[in-house]
Structure formats: structure tokens, C-alpha cells
């Protein structure tokens, strides 16, 4: 018997209903901010996908050669594709360009709870504005999306420019900066201490204290003032702190200021944030930030940008008590008669035209078996139709939960009860 590939999933109808409903609620938030939906190819050139992706993700790419021997890869996330899309389609469009997307991505992960080789991302990118209000708009949209689905979460917000200012003050190489940022992202404290000690010995500097002062300060907005006092000689770090202060003035939500956020992708340049779902033991469900150099890296004009992506599957794990109401209607003809079947089809068509999902018994079951079928599918509303009901113009609607039965006027199906 064939089995699904490792790290992939099949979704049952009840799971898909839940996924589609959550997707719809998140889309509604994006639409309310007037972001426009786009889509990109599932695969792109390997050169594009690997150009500015974190080393760990680069090693997890699904790579193949097409029939023209061109090296391709399945997208591991959307931002690189969206940057390419922007350069191809929108570079001359009035700014800002506000886009959102939803689709599947692929990484050769070690499958475990909340981590799959095929997974879904939903996110947004705002390109063309370097103003603090743009960062705030993206932050607010990410937060309000999760609030719309009643998810319990915590958002941590930081700024890469704070540590960048420390690195520049001590003249660290780009390679050292990248290594330190990756160790921070992996929360490898011992590895970070060793690397910083090695740098101190090679350069005869004392950098460890400042780095850990930045990393260990967490809390509310007051953390920014405290860190300013510790970084008075670090001009670029102070600029970053002032920028973050301005952004947070425009974010009317609860958050934790955390400068230990480094993000696993190499293209972030300014404000960064991560959102953790509380149900799954603080698993990250969303991440994003500012990336002002990425468009230029892909041979476009320098364009400031900010965005984020939801890990859609992890969101699902965090709200498994999310109730999906089944509002479908099941029509049971009491006998397999052409006249009766035609009338059932007419009634079903009218109900569907008014937005109701309707199923007709297609198996010619006896009434008890048809009702058992409705119960097995958790259908709450059943219409049982005989010839007398058609002639009288009133059809019986049975509530499968309460057993209550009422007569509905065939001419008034627009006001069919929920």
C-alpha cells in the first residue's frame, strides 16, 4: 500500500474546515489593511533561494535539475520569491506596495510535532517605506490577525541595529557578525561565549560584557531607556533604540522588548519580532521584521521593506479547541421517485443559491439509515421530504441535536433557520 511521503500530511474534511475558517479570518485582517494577495511559483531558481537565506535553511532545500539542467529548488519560505516578484512586476508602482500570500513551503526537516517537510506559510510584505509607521502597521496587523482567531500568544520585539552598533564599534568582520547572530538565534549561550572569547583574544578587546548586556535585558518599553544608559558611547546602537522607541509608540498592544531575537534568515536589518503561542510550550508561530537591503541584493533598486510570516500549521496546533460549526443541510427523499427527486433538487438549488451548503441522500437509503448517515457526518439540520410535503408547500426541518422538528414554507427558503 502506498504511503504519504515522510514529513507530509493528509488533511481530513473536518481538519480542512478548521484550516479554511482560520485562513479566512486571517485574510480578513490583511484585506482590512488593504494588502493585496499575490502568489508565486512553488519552485524558483536555486540561485535565488540560496542567495540570502540562513545556512541551516540553505542546507534543507529540496533541490533538483530541470530538463534543461537548470538547478531549481522548492521554496523554503516566501520572502525571496516576493522580492523577485516585486522587481519583476512592481518596481515602478507607486509606493508602498502592500502584498500578502498563502501557500505551501518545503524544507528537508527532521519531522516532529509542529515541524514538517511540507508546511504552510501566510504572510505579508510592505515594500517602499522606511517610516516607523510602516513597521508599526505590519506589527499591528500580525498581532490583530492572531487576536481574530482568539489565540493566546506573546510577542517579543527587538532591533538588530542595537547589536550591529556594538559590532561596528569593535570593528568585527561580517563573518564574525553572522556567526554571532546565528549562535544567538539558536540560543547557544556556551558557543556564543567561546566565539566572543576567541574574538577578544584575537583583537585584544572586551566585547562579551556589552553583548550580554544587550541580550539579557528584557521587559516592557522601559528596557529601551535602561539600555541607552549602558550604550552611551555606541552611536548606531542608540539610533536603533530610538527607532524602536518610535515604532513601539505606535503599537497599542502588549509586548516584550527582547534584543535576543536574531532571526534565522540573513536578510533582516532593523526591527525584528517573534510571536510565541502559549499553548504549545512557547513555540514560535510568527516571525518578521525589516529588511532594507534584500531587494537590492536581487538586482533591484534599493527599496526599504518590512514583513512577516505566520507558521500556519503551528497556529493550528495552538488553537485545537477552535470550534467549527457545521451549517450544512441534508435532504432525505422518503422514496426513490423521479418526481420527488426533482423536487428535492429544486429545493436544494434554492437553498444553495441563498448560501447554504446542501447534500442530498444519493444512496436511496431507508429513513433510519439516512439519519444515521447524517449523525455520522455531524450534520445538524435534516429535511425529510415526501410527496405530501411537496403538495402542501411545507417541508419538515429536523434538528438532529434536539430532535425538534418544524415546518418550513417552501416559498420562504430565503429565511431558512440556522
Swiss-Prot record:
Reaction it catalyzes: tRNA(His) + L-histidine + ATP = L-histidyl-tRNA(His) + AMP + diphosphate + H(+)
Highest rank taxon of the organism: Archaea
Coiled coil: none
SUPFAM superfamilies: Class II aaRS ABD-related, Class II aaRS and biotin synthetases
Pfam families for this protein: HGTP_anticodon, tRNA-synt_His
GO MF terms held by the record: ATP binding; histidine-tRNA ligase activity
UniProt keyword terms in alphabetical order: Aminoacyl-tRNA synthetase, ATP-binding, Cytoplasm, Ligase, Nucleotide-binding, Protein biosynthesis
Family, per entry: Belongs to the class-II aminoacyl-tRNA synthetase family.
NCBIfam families (alphabetical): hisS, hisZ_biosyn_reg
Protein name in UniProt: Histidine--tRNA ligase
Species of origin: Methanococcus vannielii (strain ATCC 35089 / DSM 1224 / JCM 13029 / OCM 148 / SB)
Source organism phylogeny: Archaea, Methanobacteriati, Methanobacteriota, Methanomada group, Methanococci
